[in-house]
Structures are given as C-alpha cells and as structure tokens.
Swiss-Prot record:
The gene is DBP1. A motif (Q motif) lies at residues 138-166. Residues 169-358 form the Helicase ATP-binding domain. It is an enzyme of class 3 (hydrolase). It comes from Candida glabrata (strain ATCC 2001 / BCRC 20586 / JCM 3761 / NBRC 0622 / NRRL Y-65 / CBS 138) (Yeast). This is ATP-dependent RNA helicase DBP1. Belongs to the DEAD box helicase family. DDX3/DED1 subfamily.
Amino acid sequence: MSDGSGRYVPPHIRRGGGNSHESAAADGLSGSRYSGNGFFSSPNRGNHKSSGGFFGSRPFNDRRTGQGSRASGSGGFGGSGGRYGWVNGKHVPYPKNPRLEMELFGNATDHVTSGINFDNYDDIPVEASGDNVPEAITEFKSPPLDELLLENVELANFSKPTPVQKYSIPIVTKNRDLMACAQTGSGKTGGFLFPVLSELFLNGPAPLPEHTRHSYMRKCYPSALVLAPTRELAIQIFDEAKKYTYRSWVKPYVVYGGAPIGQQMRDMDRGCNLLVATPGRLNDLLERGKISLVNVKYLVLDEADRMLDMGFEPQIRHIVEDCDMPSVNDRQTLMFSATFPREIQHLARDFLKDYIFLSVGRVGSTSENIQQKVLFVEDYDKNSALLDILINEIDGLTLVFVETKRMADQLTDFLIVQNFKATAIHGDRTQAERERALHAFRNGIANILVATAVAARGLDIPNVTNVINYDLPTDIDDYVHRIGRTGRAGNVGVATSFFNSNSMNIAKELMDLLTEANQEVPQFLVNMVQDSMRFGRGGRNSRTGSNRGRGSNTRDYRHSNKDDWGSLGSSRRGFRSNDNRGFGNNWGSSSGDGFTNKAANSWW
C-alpha cells in the first residue's frame, strides 16, 4: 500500500495511522469487520444480534490482548503499550462499558428471580465421593473465585451458589477432575463456567507452542473447551460465557453445525480462549487446521451422558485421543449432566483421572419445585385436553413436547387456528428459523413453544411455568430432562403429561419418580403398573433394558466390585456417530415421516 505520494508504507506504520483497521474497530466504525457484518451482529442470529457485534469496540476484541489466535503479533501477550487484558503477567480488567453491560445483563427487573423455594435447595442431600474432597463453599467469595468473576456474577443477579456450585467451585479450583450429577435447572452451567473462568482470569493465557510462533496460518488455541450435544445448548452456554467474561482478557466463541463454516473461521481470527462447540463442527475445524487443542487446560462435557450414549462417542474420542489435546494427566476434565447411567460412568473412566463424583439429590431425579400431573388421555382426545389446559389453567410460557416433527408442525398450526401465539422448533427447521422461534418464546412474543426432543435437554429458557408432555418419551431419563425445563433456579413450575397404553414401557419408572418427588400418583397409573407386573410386562427402561428402580444411578460405581466394573470394559462401542442429532435429524422424532417442513408455522 502507498501513501498519497505513491511511496510504499510498511504495515507497522499503516497500523499506527488514523485510517488503520484497528482504529476503526476502536471507534466502532461501520466499516470495521468487527461492527455489523460478522457472526455476532447478523440480523438472523437471534439472541446474538447486536449493534457492533458482541465484542463491541477494541477493548473487547483486540487480538493482541490475550493468547487465543495465531494472528497475535507478539505471541499473544498484551501487545506493545496494551493497558488492559493480560499485561505483564497480570490481569487488568477493561473499563466498564454501560452499553455492553446493558446488552449482556439487562435491567435488574429483567432477571429471573430466585423462586420461593430456592432456599429449600440447602436441604437437598449432596454426596461427594473420592479422595480428599475439598470443603464446600457457602457463598460466592474470593478466594476461591476471582474478583472480576464475582462482579459479573453479581451483575447477573446471583446472590448465592446452588448446591452443585457449592461443591464444583472448590473442586475445580483445587485442580480435580469432576463428574457432577444434579437436578435439571440447578445451576450446572455456572457450576463449570464460574471456576473455569475464574482460574483463567487468575492464571492468564498459556504461551503458544514454540514451533507455531512463525506459522503463516491463523489458528486458534483455546484454553478451555466445552462440548455440547446440540447447537441450541452450545449457543446457550456461549451466551452465559459472554456475561461472565465481561471486561476480561478471555474471549468466548461458539461453533456448531448449520451455520456457515467460513464465517465462523473468519470470526475466530479475532481470537478464542474459551470455545463452545458441537462435536461434528469441531472435528471439521480440526481437520481444516483452524483450531489446535494443544493449550486446552479445561475440557468440559455438558450433557455428557447424551453425547456418549446416543452416538457421539467416536467423535469425542477422536477429539480427545487422536488430536493434539493434552493427555488426561495434563488437563482437567469435567462432566456435567442430570443423569449418569452406570454404563456411562464406566465410559467416563477413559476421560477422567482420580475424579470426584458429585451427586446432588438423587441422580436422574426431578425437582420438588415441579408439580407433576399425569392424566389418562387417549390419542384422539389430546387436542381437546390440551385446549382445556391452555384455556383454563395456564398463565405464562408453556413448552409442549411431541414425538415427531410432523406432529410439531400440525399441532402448532392447530394452536394458531385456535388463536394461540405458538411457534415450533424441531430438526427440519433451519437454524435461522429455530433461533427466531427460541427468541420469540424467550421474549414472550410467542407464549407456546411446540418442540420435539431437540429442545429437551440443557436449554435454560427463563420463566417457563408449564411443560406439557403431549407425547410421553420412551425413556424415563428423557422425561426428567423435559419437565426440567420448568421449575428452574428454585422457581416453581407445573408439568402435565398425557398418558395412555402407548407409554406403558415407562409406567413403573414414572410411578417411582412421582413417589420420590412427593407427587400425587394417579390411581389409574398404579392399577396399570400392577396389571403389567402381574403379566410380566412394562417397567423396563427402553435404553438400558434394566429396571431403574428407586435410588438407582445414585452411587459412584468405582465402589462396585471388579467384576461389575469389568462387565463393560473400556472398549470403544459401535455407537452411531452423527453430529446432526438434533440438527438435521431430531432426537426422539421420526426422521422418516416424509413431512416437508413449513417455514411459516409460526403465528407471526
């Protein structure tokens, strides 16, 4: 490039000039690639929409402030003259940005308040097994948490840790691996984000590998990797990470299938220290050489049982064992979920070392904050029963679960004709349509969301007061995750399920679950279970083929005898690998129903 006189101007001189790219970014000019045409500010990105993108001005996106991208000209540590970020071996928080703060945290009145039963969480039994279990904390404080992290937690309106956080925070900060099982809606996301981010804030970025210092290719070197089974859950975790990395040197990013990979690769050039990913898209980026895992200090598997048990095991093993990720002894591995069947605990041995098993409440149990109702409704009466509930009993956001994509569209159309503001989410809808549907539901534009199992696990949608199982799932663990979309963070909710003879395979487990949660067990369910047991039918878990039974899945199976442990071994089982679960083909739905999705099946 030349100046006005035609003379060549070196890049380091151009960067210092008033027309530099970085100056434009710092000033928030629309011409900057950081401000209006990137992933974070795309108008079709639902909750990611923002004027100027998530990172905003340079203090939130300058690559020089922290390791994470190969584009850093000085090895990723501070840049010459950098005043904020990781500077001279110390974390210097960026100044407050009121506009970004409002965008991330909203007004105090926007937050989901702790419900009337939040304090009852202190009475939930907690079991922590393993060697030298760290003492639980009772409040958010420093230490063990970093001061900046505490400020961001306060901005998010969290005043006290949930039971899983009370234990997970000291466990992670003491450099221990963790397998954590807790009720849905009990703060598992904060259970790993809080301590991981706090440790990153305190310890700073790892140096780039020596052999990469002079590489011409831009590559991201995340310090923390979070794997999630669905793109909706990945986006949700990323949204939370944006809040808690506010004003820090850590840059979060999310990658998932269904979005343009080229745009994701360009966005990662800005740096990525905490990466949230679905396994398929991450494998793609690893094969393209865009990401290196050599600096990963923290590996988190959220909804780990679903990823391992439902077909993601080969992809996860490739990521963990065949790429350049540090070995199990050189990283911390954290596994979080609401259910952990014994087989999955056995598989976890390959990913964790000397770990602590944390069980908050009964593993796979439901929260007593959820009032559970089971009604006997034949298939041909379901629409009428649903209307009766929606008209007479429900106020607030309602999540309706069905088994097939076809039924999701048909039921949504039916509700719209009945003048309800409804929308649908399932695997045949495009990514933009799904994000718009979730955005409308979260913000009350549509107060009814009809969903297949794609939305059943992990999603934290505030203010969902009612869950209706129009179709019951075939697996009792899926039932737990579905109804866990309400009654979150200590708030109360109602879950209503339509039961008939088609759901007999979970009848016994459902009755046990209702009993354990101190819920009313309808007499028809008791009679049907007794009849099925008399004739040797029902009461079997469809996935494992074994009786769940009261109190099963609660203990640390390392305490089982050797024969029990060795019954499954650590061999790689032939699970089907498909990152399109919940993306192109929907979990729990009929993928071959021949139904063509109607993009217009939303009331707006």
